[in-house]
Amino acid sequence: MTADSTEIPQLALPLSQSPAAGKRARRILCGVDEAGRGPLAGPVTAAAVVLNPRKPIQGLADSKVLTAKKREALYDEIVEKALAWHVAEATVEEIDRINILHATMLAMQRAVQGVAAQGVLPDLVQVDGNRCPQVAFAVEAIVKGDALVPAISAASILAKVTRDRQLAALHIAFPQYGFDVHAGYGTPQHLAAIERHGVTPHHRRSFAPVRRALDGAPPPAGDAVPQTDAKTAWAD
């Protein structure tokens, strides 16, 4: 699949059924994670990282438990020391066209393809969560992998820092929405800004609060975003 493809990606076979499983000793591990599944605006971002065992990185952890300052410092160290890394995304248009789950898988596919394009071919791709994208390598899902597997922790940091930077840039273009504060998540501040200023081209029209705003419907009682549409601002 090319970087511009919007073909709906298939979920991977479980590791035991993957044709690549068991063919080689697993020495090159590639961690994969995403940021931005839940927000009402902006792309969904994914990163793939192959760490260099000869250049250990101290302090790797789930990006959600790190301060922004610590994430930025680790980002610089990861891109300097990793054997290979790549950050990719699926656009708002792709999210609306194929849904957020498939768009997330697409971004992950692109991230792994970016690592492979550097000549680093993983023996095993380890993905945070309970679903895997279909890639040309053995792959396994690890629930809470961003807290358990260093390469996934590194990927979570690259994905989150990249997406936070994108939303900070979006704030400069649309300061009235407060993207620098909520990163596109459905906070009361963001919902109020949508009601007051309308929807930007960067909002996900397939998400219910945005769709309601476009239809002119009032927000539901309590003015809260349903959990099916968004997670908290610290969830990625």
From Swiss-Prot:
Pfam family, one: RNase_HII
Cofactor(s) listed in the protein's UniProt record: Mn(2+); Mg(2+)
SUPFAM superfamilies recorded: Ribonuclease H-like
Annotated region (Disordered), positions in chain: 212-236
Comment on bound cofactor: Manganese or magnesium. Binds 1 divalent metal ion per monomer in the absence of substrate. May bind a second metal ion after substrate binding.
UniProt: a divalent metal cation binding residues: D33, E34, D128
E.C. numbers: 3.1.26.4
A Gene Ontology cellular-component term: cytoplasm
Xref: PANTHER family: RIBONUCLEASE H2 SUBUNIT A, RIBONUCLEASE HII
Function: Endonuclease that specifically degrades the RNA of RNA-DNA hybrids.
Name listed for the protein in its UniProt record: Ribonuclease HII
Protein species of origin: Ralstonia nicotianae (strain ATCC BAA-1114 / GMI1000) (Ralstonia solanacearum)
Lineage, highest ranks first: Bacteria, Pseudomonadati, Pseudomonadota, Betaproteobacteria, Burkholderiales
